[in-house]
């Protein structure tokens, strides 16, 4: 089967991907977030930015980990100030989770840098 893309283009893609990954880690400044599951969580939240989620809804954003692990990931992000947790005004027994302004800026900086890397 003939190659669809030249090795030169493939190499360029791999290098850009590695640069993008390194930038993700540098932006967060904490190795705990250098994890694809956090990438899933944060980028899916960014796609739905402006919405507030229950913790259960957020666990579905990390399909490759167990519910128990997802609970820990969300709680860590809350404790580190990347996710904001507030009381649900409709049902005061529930909490709603949103992206903190800090996380929104980090994700948008990452996206801008990645787009530039891949251009």
Residue ranges, per PLM feature:
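A short, conserved structural fragment
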Residues: 78-88
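Short acidic, hydrophobic short linear motifs in intrinsically disordered regions
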Residues: 51-61
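Short, locally clustered residues in the helix-turn-helix/winged-helix DNA-binding domain
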Residues: 43-50
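Short alpha-helical segments that sit at the start of domains
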Residues: 13-42
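Short amphipathic alpha-helical interaction segments
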Residues: 64-79
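Amphipathic alpha-helical dimerization/coiled-coil segments
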Residues: 9, 20-24, 108-119
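General nucleic-acid-binding
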Residues: 1-11
């Amino acid at each position: 089967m003939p190659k669809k893309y030249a090795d030169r283009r493939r190499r360029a893609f791999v290098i850009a991907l590695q640069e993008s990954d390194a930038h993700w880690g540098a932006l967060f400044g904490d190795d705990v977030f250098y994890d694809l599951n956090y990438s899933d969580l944060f980028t899916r939240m960014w796609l739905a930015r402006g919405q507030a989620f229950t913790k259960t809804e957020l666990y579905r954003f990390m399909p490759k980990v167990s519910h128990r692990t997802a609970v820990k990931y969300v709680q860590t992000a809350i404790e580190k100030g990347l996710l904001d947790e507030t009381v649900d005004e409709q049902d005061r027994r529930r909490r709603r989770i949103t992206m903190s302004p800090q996380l929104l800026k980090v994700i948008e900086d990452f996206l801008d840098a990645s787009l530039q890397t891949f251009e």
